[in-house]
Amino acid sequence: MQVLVRDNNIDQALRVLKKKMQREGVFREMKMRSAYEKPSEKRVREKAEAVRRTRKLARKKLQREGLLPSPKKVARAR
């Protein structure tokens, strides 16, 4: 993974690198590989993830069709 450092601005380069790693799923992969996961636990986790994905897709579809109200956006103070 490569990040350009402009004008010796290392803070910005680190932010860009972290964002790229997050998008690629590197942090999640490192967390998953930090300890051994038994095959039975892996099956359970993958099944739960699949259920979560299908529920999310169904919820998004209902929101698009107007049957469910869309989530309210919360304004955050910066």
UniProtKB/Swiss-Prot annotation:
It comes from Rhizobium meliloti (strain 1021) (Ensifer meliloti). Residues 58-78 are annotated as: Disordered. The gene is rpsU1. InterPro entries: Ribosomal_bS21 (IPR001911), Ribosomal_bS21_sf (IPR038380). One of its GO terms (biological process) is translation. Belongs to the bacterial ribosomal protein bS21 family. This is Small ribosomal subunit protein bS21A. Keywords: Ribonucleoprotein, Ribosomal protein. It holds the Pfam family Ribosomal_S21. One of its GO terms (molecular function) is structural constituent of ribosome. GO terms for cellular component: ribonucleoprotein complex; ribosome. NCBIfam families: S21p (TIGR00030). Gene3D superfamilies: Ribosomal protein S8 (1.20.5.1150).
